[in-house]
């Protein structure tokens, strides 16, 4: 079986945008995850997500991998952006929308 750290590496490097969250965007299981997912959805790009409650291995190991202790965790372009606060701040300034569109390979100036 693939080592959990290899799985995480594959997820963050194989997807332009990954949100590690408690629950799913449709059914978030914590307020912070809900707000981070809503901010991302508002950017209008598709993103990958991992429900860490259904993946205890990732739940236990991601904080070590990233040196970031809490969830949600937003990864864009293989880099850790941060948690809920940072995601909402970036969304408020319009920076999240730009990052998301660039990562998704869309021209941020369009639409």
Question: What does each model-found stretch correspond to?
Answer:
Residues 9-46:
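Local sequence-structure signature of Cys/Sec-based thiol-disulfide redox active-site neighborhoods
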Residues 76-107:
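Non-catalytic, surface beta->alpha helical segment in thiol-disulfide oxidoreductase systems
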Residues 5-6:
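Eukaryotic intrinsically disordered and solvent-exposed regulatory patches
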Residues 109-111:
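Intrinsic disorder/low-complexity signal
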Residues 44-60:
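Thiol-based oxidoreductase modules, predominantly thioredoxin-like and allied folds used
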Residues 20, 73-77:
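Acidic beta-strand-to-loop metal/phosphate-binding motif
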Residues 64-70:
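Thiol/disulfide oxidoreductase modules built on the thioredoxin-like
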């Amino acid at each position: 079986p693939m080592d959990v750290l290899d799985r995480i590496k594959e997820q963050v490097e194989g997807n332009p945008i990954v949100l590690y969250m408690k629950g799913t965007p449709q059914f978030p299981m914590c307020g912070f995850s809900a707000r981070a997912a809503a901010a991302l959805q508002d950017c209008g790009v598709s993103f990958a997500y991992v429900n860490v409650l259904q993946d205890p291995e990732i739940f236990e190991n991601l904080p070590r991998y990233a040196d970031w202790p809490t969830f949600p965790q937003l990864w864009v372009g293989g880099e850790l952006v941060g948690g809920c606060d940072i995601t909402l701040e970036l969304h408020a300034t319009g920076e999240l929308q730009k990052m998301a569109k660039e990562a998704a390979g869309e021209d941020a100036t369009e639409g």
